[in-house]
Amino acid sequence: MKFSPLLDEMMKALQVLPGVGPKSAQRMAFTLLERERSGGLRLAQLLSRALTEIGHCSHCRTFTENERCEICANPKREENGLLCVVESPADVAAIEQTGQFSGRYFVLMGHLSPLDGIGPEELGLEILERRLKDEAISELILATNPTIEGDATAWYIADMARAAGVKVSRIAHGVPVGGELELVDGTTLSHSLMGRQPLN
């Protein structure tokens, strides 16, 4: 069904968000216009501001409004010498929410994918290589996604780290906590068996 051209444009624009199809976009647009106009205006203002003002940290490449993000600006995060490499700022947020990591990050903003034209330069690996040589990094933790591209990216970076004399580790992959073995796919189970840990 056709609505006003502006409403149609609004619904198409909402579909750029992940998981939002035509029906969800229509529901969101109608909600904003029917009963959330002030919230919609606030959202529009914040979106405009965020898209204009938020850039990348010059040190780790995560999102920030400043030259350096809060994590990179915090000297306590340098003390243990840990550097964790992730694919996206969302991965930084996920790790930070665990409260288990107190080191620093490097955000690739993707993974190696020659077919899509994404090579080492697009991932800022020259910046990472410089950090490996110039900073006191005791261990590089590779937390790329457990995909073919994520694994290839991890191996590429591991070679770089070894060449710089930095210890390298990869986050564990496997059976989720509370999961049942019979429901786990073969690849995940295989990774779990290969990455098994001794019980002390």
Swiss-Prot record:
Q: Name one Pfam family in it.
A: RecR_HhH
Sorted alphabetically, the keyword list is: DNA damage, DNA recombination, DNA repair, Metal-binding, Zinc, Zinc-finger
UniProt xrefs under InterPro entries? DNA_Rcmb_RecR, Rcmb_RecR, Rcmb_RecR_Znf, TOPRIM_dom, TOPRIM_RecR
Where do the zinc-finger regions (C4-type) map?
Answer: 57-72
- According to the entry, every stretch annotated as the Toprim domain falls at 81-176
GO BP annotations listed: DNA recombination; DNA repair
Q: List the disulfide bonds.
A: none
Function as written in the Swiss-Prot or TrEMBL entry: May play a role in DNA repair. It seems to be involved in an RecBC-independent recombinational process of DNA repair. It may act with RecF and RecO.
User: What PANTHER family does the record tag this protein with?
Assistant: RECOMBINATION PROTEIN RECR
Q: What is this protein called?
A: Recombination protein RecR
Source organism per entry reads Aeromonas hydrophila subsp. hydrophila (strain ATCC 7966 / DSM 30187 / BCRC 13018 / CCUG 14551 / JCM 1027 / KCTC 2358 / NCIMB 9240 / NCTC 8049)
